[in-house]
Amino acid sequence: MSEELQQKLRDQLWEVANKLRGNMSASDFMYFTLGFIFYKYLSEKIEKHANDALVDDEVTFKELWAMEKNEDIEELQEVVKTECLENIGYFIEPNFLFSSVIESIKRKENILPMLERSLKRIEDSTLGQDSEEDFGGLFSDIDLASPKLGKTADDKNTLVSNVLLALDDIDFGVEASQEIDILGDAYEYMISQFAAGAGKKAGEFYTPQEVSRILAEIVTIGHARLRNVYDPTCGSGSLLLRAASIGHANEIFGQEKNPTTYNLARMNMLLHGIKFSNFRIENGDTLEADAFGDTQFDAVVANPPFSAEWSAADKFNNDDRFSKAGRLAPRKTADYAFILHMIYHLNEGGTMACVAPHGVLFRGNAEGVIRRFLIEKKNYVDAIIGLPANIFYGTSIPTCILVFKKCRKEDDNILFIDASKEFEKVKTQNKLRPQHIKKIVDTYRERKEIEKYSHLATLQEVAENDYNLNIPRYVDTFEEEEPIDIHAVMKEIKELEAKRADLDKEIEGYLKELGLVE
């Protein structure tokens, strides 16, 4: 994979995005841009797939559909359509391909009605197919009648046409299957750039790559190949994809509450070459309507919304996810509701890692009861990792990573890592560099103690701290100041005062020579 090609594609796609920026918010022009990129990708992919299927028939996809209809032609068309639906999950007739829309633009036609039909035809082609859930409503956020695209129909048509023409000039590399990672990388880059400009909204759909890397590395330790990976608040799916890639996972599962972000996650899966039959992303509220029943997973990763509200309804006292902990998570801080949900879906030999605000480590009342249950009764807490502040878009609060395992032994300790001071400041953000990530992961893997960085606490030690997991209780990062020699300081002050007096006399002499003072 060429880094130069990667950067070129990133720059080209971001330039296209800026054509749409105008008066739109970052999130608005993100969905249009990523949707159009995805449409071009699907078009090029199906054209390649259909052409490959027709090699022995010595006819191209477009040529076949342009032929005069007869029984043999229609039969061959149906074979191609069925083959596409079974293998890549969707079908686009040649006159609805991205390239056909471009031809209409070059003829100076109004392409919005055709484009709208094209996107609808992609979704409709999957009805009744195994891929229906993966494609249904996928383009619902692309509103071509939106006033954000322009005041008049002509304005809208001109803007969208210019964006599509710019995309047409970019080589996605779909013809070369090994280049799929380059396009996937560029798509991830686009999402990260949009997140940087989305402020607080960024947390709804994006986990910084550095944090994703740590979570993914941790949950894959000890697993040559994961059977599956799950994220209950999957956002755009970036964290899921990272964990699946590092762990060579066969299947990917996720749930996302926001319908728009849910669409983004499904696009992200498909654009990274994940076959429709190998992932299942559901739209819904994870806590209120768990889409995965009693399914358990080899690895669970998540960056749940920090201290979000949930109903904490009485019915959850009888919900197997929460009932054994003794108390429900507070209505105004659902952090432990997400944690208990994730643990419920973790299999006995798996690892779970999630991001949370530091409050989960020490808050009392119901959360204190749940925390004690997880440590004393279950012995599930494997590690606590403190991260630097200001590494997430839209919030500057310090965060931590919590690692859980169900297969811990009675005498296992809990590893505390304080990585809060190891980062590089880049403009207004703090960044974790490869060496910082490596130190965190290596320290966790080797479970080693490093002075002022990590500590292995026994369960007895944690109990003596009343099950408070606040990192400073276990990792002493205090730097002693060198003792001050008062006598030496006083001597230095006297010497400086004497020098100042000498300089004052010297200056006074110069001023007298110049006649400026008597």
Descriptions of predicted regions:
Residues 40-53, 194, 223, 247, ...:
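A generic secondary-structure signal for well-formed alpha-helical elements
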Residues 201-302, 307-316, 322-325, 336-337, ...:
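Conserved S-adenosyl-L-methionine
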Residues 195-198, 250-251, 424-425:
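Short small-residue beta-strand/loop micro-motif enriched in glycine and branched aliphatics
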Residues 3-5, 157-158, 183, 187, ...:
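Short, flexible segments with low predicted structural confidence
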Residues 1-214, 218-219, 277-286, 291, ...:
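Non-catalytic, mostly N-terminal accessory regions of nucleic-acid modification and defense proteins
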Residues 4, 290, 294-518:
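A conserved structural/catalytic subdomain of Rossmann-like adenosyl-cofactor enzymes
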